[in-house]
Each structure stands twice: as C-alpha cells, then as structure tokens.
C-alpha cells in the first residue's frame, strides 16, 4: 500500500467514525453495530448499520478497501484503457433512511481508485458526492443542502459546483421513469484533473460537508407530525430509490461484479417499500408537488427560502 493510499484510508476511517457519531446524537438508545469483514479475493472493510432507531429507521455507513488483479466491467467500460490493470478501491458510502416522511433520505460517497500495470505509471482517480431524496419537499432544506455543497466546492474553482451539480442531476436520473431520484447535490467521478494533493483536499471537503449539509435538516424535521397516508407515500417513493440502486447505480454494479460483499453493497436499500400499480398523486396535493416542483431541474441557490418555513 502506497503512502497516498495509506493517507486516503486513514481519512476515510476517520470520516466513517465522525459521521456515525454525529448521526447517533439523534438516537437515545440505538447505536450503530459494526460488522468487520474480509473479502476472499482481496481486502475487506467495516460495515456499520443502525436500525429501528427513534429517528433513523435504517442507515448504513460502510468503509471498504478491496483489491484485485483486474477491474470489473462496470469500472472499465467507460475507460477501456484500464482493462487488464490490477486495482485498489477504497471508499466510504452511506445511506440514511429516516422514519419520518418529512426527513429526506440522504446518500454520500467518497472513494479512491488506483489501477496499476507492470511497466506503466499507476492511474488514480477520485469520485464521490452527496445527494438528497425528499418525500415532502421543503425549499429551506433544498437551499441549505445546495448552499453547503457550493461552499465546499468554492475553494477549488468558480465552476466546480455548477459542473458537479449538473453531473449529479444527470447521474441520478431514473431513465425508465423519466424522473430524478431526488433534488441532487454533487456527483463526480474519474477526478484527477488537479494534482493528487488538491484532489485529495477536495474529497476531504466533500466528505466533511455531508455532516453540515444533512444534520440541520434532520434536526428541523424529525419531530414533525405525519399521517399514515404520508408514510405510505414515503414507502411508495422509496420504490424509486430501490429501482435506481439496483438498475443504474455504478457503485452497486461495481460491488456485485467485483465479488464484493452483498450485505454491505445492499445496505443502501430501505427496510419497507411499496409499489402500487399506476398510482398517481392527486392534482394540487403535497405529493404531486414533489414531482411537479421539487423534482425538477432547478437553481436552488437562486431561491430565497420562505420566511414561514419551519
């Protein structure tokens, strides 16, 4: 393991610790359980899962460090020059599914790949980002989420936020539904346009920003009253989340195709989901407003949160 890889690994392990500790502040008795695992083909990780808390219905914060003699098709398909190289892949990936339909689901991921071949220079890149999936939208939350994202990107260039926001909107699009998974955030991959130290600093900025972006939203919404109808709508929309993760998500496909640990890969799936045949929201309802307003390509930084928002 190179010095660079060691530095990335140390940061990712610390990030996992800090995120778990921050999320546990919302729970009285429930804590993350840790499952350390080893990958027979090389590497391993530590999966941390929290279930049936008072605020978090299910959440997972996973660290993995795996390696192998060749990249799986999901990783090399868009970069064929990497075929036949050995690889190391390190990352922290998390998904939080709250009980309350007024609290959005959040996802974040930061990762590092290095691909090597004898007689050639190593090829490395970073990837990651974070995105938010509300069920009952709130402008204040959307603006806050994107403002934190923009502030994390600002030191690295005036167009970084706008580029990675657009990439996020494109990536988290459910093609067979022709709708986005949520209100976006940041997404990037194959990042090596700067030197290693700058790219690593950027990854740290994004990883650290997740806590600042998500925790205030949870704090504002976790005690809001909700109805059984709203809970059912949350479960219905969770179905979209499952569809995206199992059909399109690059990380899920990479993990499964590279012989990754299935339990850790699928920890992102919500505990309860609902599919209703050809269900449509009532025109003018809160449920309809989610798709008609919030799940639209929007410049959230150009809006001002309504004064009455709670």
Curated annotation (Swiss-Prot):
One of its GO terms (cellular component) is cytoplasm. Its cofactor is a divalent metal cation. Its EC number is 1.3.3.3. The active site is at 107 (proton donor). It is found in: Cytoplasm. Keywords: Cytoplasm, Heme biosynthesis, Metal-binding, Oxidoreductase, Porphyrin biosynthesis. This is Oxygen-dependent coproporphyrinogen-III oxidase. It comes from Pseudomonas fluorescens (strain SBW25). The lineage of its organism: Bacteria, Pseudomonadati, Pseudomonadota, Gammaproteobacteria, Pseudomonadales.
């Amino acid at each position: 393991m190179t010095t660079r890889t060691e530095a990335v690994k140390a940061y990712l392990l610390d990030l996992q610790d800090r995120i778990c500790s921050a999320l546990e502040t919302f729970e009285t008795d429930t804590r993350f359980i840790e499952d350390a695992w080893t990958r027979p083909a090389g590497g391993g990780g530590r999966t941390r899962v929290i279930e049936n808390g008072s605020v978090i219905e299910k959440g997972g914060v996973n660290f993995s460090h795996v390696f192998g003699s060749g990249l799986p098709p999901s990783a090399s398909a868009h970069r064929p020059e990497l075929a036949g190289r050995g690889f190391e892949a390190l990352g922290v990936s998390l998904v939080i599914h709250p009980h309350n339909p007024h609290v959005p689901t959040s996802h974040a991921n930061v990762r590092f790949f290095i691909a090597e071949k004898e007689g050639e220079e190593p090829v490395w890149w970073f990837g990651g980002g974070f995105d938010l999936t509300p069920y009952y939208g709130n402008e204040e939350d959307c603006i806050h989420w994107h403002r934190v994202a923009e502030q994390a990107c600002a030191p690295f260039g005036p167009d970084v936020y706008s580029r990675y926001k657009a990439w996020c909107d494109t990536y988290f699009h459910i093609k067979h539904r022709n709708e986005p998974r949520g209100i976006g955030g940041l997404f990037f991959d194959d990042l090596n346009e700067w030197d290693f130290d700058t790219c690593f600093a950027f990854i740290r900025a994004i990883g650290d920003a997740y806590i600042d972006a998500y925790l205030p939203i949870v704090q504002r919404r976790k005690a809001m009253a909700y109805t059984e109808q709203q809970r059912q709508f949350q479960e219905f929309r969770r179905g979209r989340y499952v569809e995206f993760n199992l059909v399109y998500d690059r990380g899920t496909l990479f993990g499964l195709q590279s012989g990754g640990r299935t339990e850790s890969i699928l920890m992102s799936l919500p505990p309860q989901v609902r599919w209703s045949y050809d269900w449509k929201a009532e025109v003018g309802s809160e449920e309809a407003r989610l798709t008609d307003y919030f799940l639209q390509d929007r410049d959230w930084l150009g809006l001002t949160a309504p004064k009455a928002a709670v």
